[in-house]
């Protein structure tokens, strides 16, 4: 399935200008039909999955309790 720049921006939650700049720089593969750029949707699947996995990992690390230090001495 192919998406326009506007649809791709909505799908990836990025701005249209940023998507267009990535297309023009060749960082996103796209087909130009003479009127608009068409971007293959599946090329983002792996990237978005990895991004979600990374977010979950960061959240897991942030939710992990800080262990008490066994070397702490009571100085009373």
Curated annotation (Swiss-Prot):
<dbReference type="GO" id="GO:0003677">
    <property type="term" value="F:DNA binding"/>
</dbReference>
<protein>
    <recommendedName>
        <fullName>Uncharacterized protein YoeD</fullName>
    </recommendedName>
</protein>
<dbReference type="InterPro" id="IPR038148">
    <property type="entry name" value="Tn1545/Tn916_Xis"/>
</dbReference>
<dbReference type="InterPro" id="IPR041657">
    <property type="entry name" value="HTH_17"/>
</dbReference>
<dbReference type="Pfam" id="PF12728">
    <property type="entry name" value="HTH_17"/>
</dbReference>
<dbReference type="InterPro" id="IPR010093">
    <property type="entry name" value="SinI_DNA-bd"/>
</dbReference>
């Amino acid at each position: 399935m192919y998406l326009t720049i506007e649809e791709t921006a909505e799908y990836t939650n990025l701005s249209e200008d940023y998507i267009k700049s990535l297309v023009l720089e060749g960082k996103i593969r796209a087909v130009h039909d003479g009127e608009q750029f068409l971007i293959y949707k599946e090329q983002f699947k792996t990237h978005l999955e990895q991004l979600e996995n990374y977010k979950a990992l960061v959240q897991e690390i942030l939710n992990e309790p800080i262990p008490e230090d066994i070397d702490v001495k009571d100085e009373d």
